Swiss-Prot record:
Part of the 50S ribosomal subunit; part of the 5S rRNA/L5/L18/L25 subcomplex. Contacts the 5S rRNA. Binds to the 5S rRNA independently of L5 and L18. NCBIfam families: PRK05943.1. One of its GO terms (cellular component) is cytosolic large ribosomal subunit. Gene3D superfamilies: Ribosomal Protein L25, Chain P. Keywords: Ribonucleoprotein, Ribosomal protein, RNA-binding, rRNA-binding. Residues 1-20 are annotated as: Disordered. GO terms for molecular function: 5S rRNA binding; structural constituent of ribosome. This is Large ribosomal subunit protein bL25. InterPro entries: Rbsml_bL25/Gln-tRNA_synth_N, Ribosomal_bL25/Gln-tRNA_synth, Ribosomal_bL25_short, Ribosomal_L25_dom, Ribosomal_uL5_bac-type. SUPFAM superfamilies: Ribosomal protein L25-like. Belongs to the bacterial ribosomal protein bL25 family. One of its GO terms (biological process) is translation. Pfam families: Ribosomal_L25p.
Amino acid sequence: MSFKFNAEVRSKQGKGASRRLRHNGQIPAIVYGGSEAPVSIVLNHDELNNAQIHDSFYSDTIILVIEGKEISVKVQAMQRHPFKPKLVHIDFKRV
């Protein structure tokens, strides 16, 4: 199964901005690795939450579309809420 998600570059950083994103149904994330600089992005929570149910989400290559550019990544780390079925933050590593 292949996964493809649309992402936006984050303009505001910090705890308050991240909380506002989560409250609006989005997840802060970061893409790093390779020769390019790390990029902070925002993803739709519901799309990722539905995709992370599949085992292949953690092992297969994921395509992120950031500003019209497709980037191949894999999940490096994922933070979940302690008792709610919600994602808090995701780290992606370029492939």
